[in-house]
Design a protein with these regions (language model features):
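Active-site loop segments of alpha/beta catalytic cores
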Residues: 39-277
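A contiguous, low-structure linker/loop signature
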Residues: 2-49, 59-68
Length: 277
């Protein structure tokens, strides 16, 4: 399709021996007391990941691809262990354990990112968080300040030191939490879901320096060329404002045909050219 290749370095804090949840969203540990048992399976050295990156660089010119590094965020990681429902109770029932988990994650993320930075400079680094849904954040600003912010503040300077930028990957409407992120040094967000009510131009007016990736409403892609074009028209002022990479907000839906996707790509290239004129 002529798109820029992307190489993603996914730094997983769960080692191969970490127990799998019995179903999606279920706990990986039967109870908080079991954390001592599973902790030795966490925070692996990820040596194969680093070896794969070195091999890729041996066979590819660095300027020929986008390098994207991903670390677990400090809302997301405890949820992977506690399970979705139990995680929300844990903020109140097990705050000390939450901090212990996130302190360990922060140390692991910093070490892994330093290793990546010694091999190559990522174009950007995302915190996998998913802290929002279509009505905004799933935690209060106070909870963010207590359980998430201190650990972002530890990791972001390392991201800066290796020459990259920190971006928060969160589903839903992140608008309310952008000031929270900015004060940690996190400089952008993705995928800025249009279906969740995100308004990119409103974000740009309130946060002129905020980096944005995504925000193209994927739900119009099977509605014909005019609908696809109209969505690019909506985004053109944001594209011209800078610090914005338009892309499908999440994956292209399965109902989009190959021909419809080609129309999307043709118009993406056209509007990218219009952006600089």
């Amino acid at each position: 399709f002529g798109l820029d290749p992307v190489y993603c370095v996914r730094i997983n804090p769960l080692g191969p021996g970490c127990p799998a949840p019995p179903k999606h969203g279920a706990p990986r540990m039967p109870g908080p007391a079991k954390y001592d048992e599973i902790e030795p399976t966490l925070f692996p050295d990820n040596a194969p990941l680093m070896d794969d990156l070195r091999e890729h660089l041996r066979t590819h010119d660095r300027e020929s691809f986008v390098l994207w590094a991903v670390v677990d965020g400090f809302f997301w990681f405890p949820r992977r262990l506690f399970g979705i429902e139990e995680h929300f109770y844990a903020f109140f029932d097990y705050p000390e354990l939450m901090h212990r988990m996130n302190a360990g994650l922060a140390e692991h993320s910093m070490e892994m990112l330093r290793q990546v930075g010694e091999i190559a400079t990522p174009d950007f680094v995302t915190f996998a968080e998913d802290m929002s849904y279509n009505h905004g954040p799933m935690l209060s600003e106070g909870m963010f300040a207590e359980f998430v912010e201190p650990y972002h503040r530890r990791v972001v300077p390392v991201i800066d030191q290796i020459g990259s930028i920190a971006i928060c990957d969160s589903d839903g409407d992140v608008t309310e939490m952008i000031p929270w992120l900015e004060r940690t040094g996190t400089r952008g967000g993705l995928p800025l879901e249009r279906q969740a009510g995100v308004d990119g131009m409103a974000i740009r007016r309130a946060h002129p320096e905020f980096v944005m990736i995504g925000h193209y409403d994927k739900m119009v892609m099977n509605r014909g060329e005019e609908a696809i074009r109209a969505e690019f028209e909506r985004l053109l002022p944001l594209m011209r404002s800078g610090r914005f990479v338009p892309s499908v907000d999440h994956q292209t839906p399965p109902g989009v045909s190959l021909e419809q996707y080609r129309v999307y790509l043709r118009l993406l290239r056209k509007y990218a050219e219009l952006r600089v004129k």
